[in-house]
Amino acid sequence: MEIFSASNVETRRGPEQWFTGTTWMDVASVPRPGAGLFRVLFEPGARTNWHTHPEGQILYVVSGTGRAQKEGEDVLEIHTGDTVYIAPDEKHWHGAAPDTFMVHIAINPALASDGATDWLEPVTDEDYLARA
């Protein structure tokens, strides 16, 4: 067993090339094989770009209300306590609802790959604001 101290967690603003709007990320690192672990705060209306993960992703909504969408499907509303499973290489996005903050924990497995996210184009306002 190892404990990774919260004092070693780096907080940084989410990069503009990955997000629309303002986000803050707490990045925890664990030795490989392992996973990427991120706590992300999305301000109202903020969201990721479309993206994929080679080994999928798990989101746990800590607080607030958000939105998530798989390419070709309807926008879904996500709430405090919800867990979202995203399959490997599934094109998707996620973020806060238009009028509320949302915080989630993102777990990106990296057992057979480097776990790198493939960041794609921004989510249009039309896609983001589609009825959830």
What is each of the regions a protein language model found here?
Residues 41-43, 52-68, 107-110:
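Short, conserved beta-strand element in jelly-roll/cupin
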Residues 72-88:
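Short acidic-glycine-tyrosine-enriched beta hairpin
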Residues 48-50, 68-69, 91-98:
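Short beta-strand His + acidic residue motifs that chelate non-heme Fe in jelly-roll/DSBH
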Residues 36-53, 88:
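Conserved short histidine dyad/triad with adjacent acidic residue
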Residues 58, 85, 99-119:
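A short hydrophobic beta-strand segment most commonly corresponding to one strand
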Residues 30, 52, 60, 78-80, ...:
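Conserved strand-loop elements at the edges of beta-sheets that form or border functional pockets
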Residues 1-35, 116-132:
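A short, N-terminal "cap"/entry segment at the start of jelly-roll beta-barrel domains
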